[in-house]
């Protein structure tokens, strides 16, 4: 069973959030992601592994291609909600100043 801390730790990096957002649009090969993200290939692989280990993305083989897909679409709702909360907090902080 995945615990909530593992999931939130996986979401604690902007690159992993961007990966999830990209993969929520369509299934992608890891080689395609290398062209989309301006980070080192080994760093990208590490981020993918963290998301796979957290159960947030799935890897499937299609011939020689390793395809990645968001395993739970509701995680995108969690990301959107966290973004809304962040904006709310910023507004409240600005109002107090």
Please tell me what each predicted stretch does.
Residues 7, 54, 64-66, 80-84:
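Short, structured secondary-structure boundary patches
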């Amino acid at each position: 069973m995945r615990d909530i801390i593992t999931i939130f730790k996986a979401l604690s990096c902007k690159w992993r959030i961007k990966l999830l957002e990209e993969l929520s649009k369509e299934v992608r090969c890891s080689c395609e992601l290398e062209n989309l993200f301006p980070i080192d290939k080994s760093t990208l692989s590490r981020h993918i592994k963290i998301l796979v280990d957290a159960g947030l993305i799935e890897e499937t083989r299609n011939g020689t291609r390793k395809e990645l897909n968001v395993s739970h679409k509701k995680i995108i709702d969690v990301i959107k909600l966290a973004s809304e909360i962040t904006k709310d907090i910023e507004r409240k902080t600005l109002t107090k100043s």
